Design a protein with these regions (language model features):
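Catalytic nucleophile-loop/oxyanion-hole region of alpha/beta-hydrolase
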Residues: 24-27, 31-32, 44-75, 203-209
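C-terminal catalytic histidine-bearing segment of alpha/beta-hydrolase fold enzymes
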Residues: 175-227
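Conserved alpha/beta-hydrolase "acid-adjacent" motif
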Residues: 167-176
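Primarily recognizes the serine-hydrolase "nucleophile elbow" in alpha/beta-hydrolase
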Residues: 63-127, 142
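Short beta-strand/loop motif that positions the catalytic acidic residue
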Residues: 154, 160-162, 166
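Short beta-strand element of the alpha/beta-hydrolase
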Residues: 11-18
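Mobile cap/lid helix-loop segments that gate and shape the active-site cleft of serine hydrolases
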Residues: 116-150, 156
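A fold-wide structural signal in alpha/beta-hydrolase
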Residues: 12, 40-44
Length: 227
């Protein structure tokens, strides 16, 4: 954890709750920000617009990244669950603004994706696809909103976790993104737990999946975000 001379922490993580781009889960919001605060991190919850088509959520998340950075935070990370994981990954991986100053302001320095929707091409969370791009979206639009298709060698580090028996968002989504990151030489951690339904949030009392917060804290320490 680092701080400016004026006392403002230089690192900040924005939490993006899930909800299938239809609504937003309170369980994946303030409790998660409180956990991050317990690690000594500056954090906030951003309730991005739902029931609106692409690029509405992407533009809103990037505007929030710019706002947080303008407040004095040098490094900005995103942590998202399910559809919020897609929103986090999309803001991290989609092409940046052509203007160098704007691109620097909206850049994401680290991403934590929890049971994320990754691909709009694979079988996916129907609500997410319906709300974001529509079930009749063109192949081009489906590809351009699939995170695994957007990975480049400029991507930041990623932490991803999922459960093998997730019936809402198949675990193949996590594997797809991890494979794309590996193919491009991007540092990343992937944890897949055998048991657990979709939407576990902090996974307290949920078997092995409860380890994700401990594993993530260790990863954040390794990446230099916490002491």
């Amino acid at each position: 954890m680092r701080a400016h001379h004026n006392g403002v922490m230089t690192d900040h993580i924005i939490v993006l709750p899930g909800g299938g781009y239809t609504d937003l889960s309170d369980d994946e919001a303030e409790p998660v920000a409180a956990w991050l605060a317990g690690l000594g991190l500056s954090s906030s919850v951003f309730r991005y617009p739902v029931q609106t088509r692409h690029p509405g959520p992407l533009d809103a998340v990037r505007a929030e990244v710019r706002r947080i950075r303008a407040d004095g935070h040098e490094r900005v990370g995103l942590l998202g669950f399910s559809a919020g994981g897609h929103a986090a990954g999309h803001a991290t991986l989609a092409p940046l603004s052509a203007d160098p100053d704007a691109a620097a302001a909206e850049r994401v320095d680290l991403a934590i994706l929890c049971y994320p929707v990754v691909s709009m091409e694979l079988p996916t969370h129907a609500d997410s696809r319906r709300q974001l791009i529509g079930l009749d979206a063109t192949p081009e639009l489906r590809a351009s909103t699939s995170l695994d298709r957007l990975v480049t060698r400029d991507a930041p580090p990623f932490f991803i976790w999922h459960t093998a028996e997730d019936a809402s968002v198949p675990v193949q989504h996590a594997y797809l993104l991890a494979t794309a990151l590996a193919d491009h030489g991007i540092p990343h951690a992937l944890h897949v737990f055998s048991r657990g339904r979709h939407g576990l949030n902090l996974a307290i009392g949920q078997g092995d999946a409860e380890q994700w917060t401990t594993l993530c804290a260790a990863w954040l320490r390794e990446e230099g975000w916490i002491a």
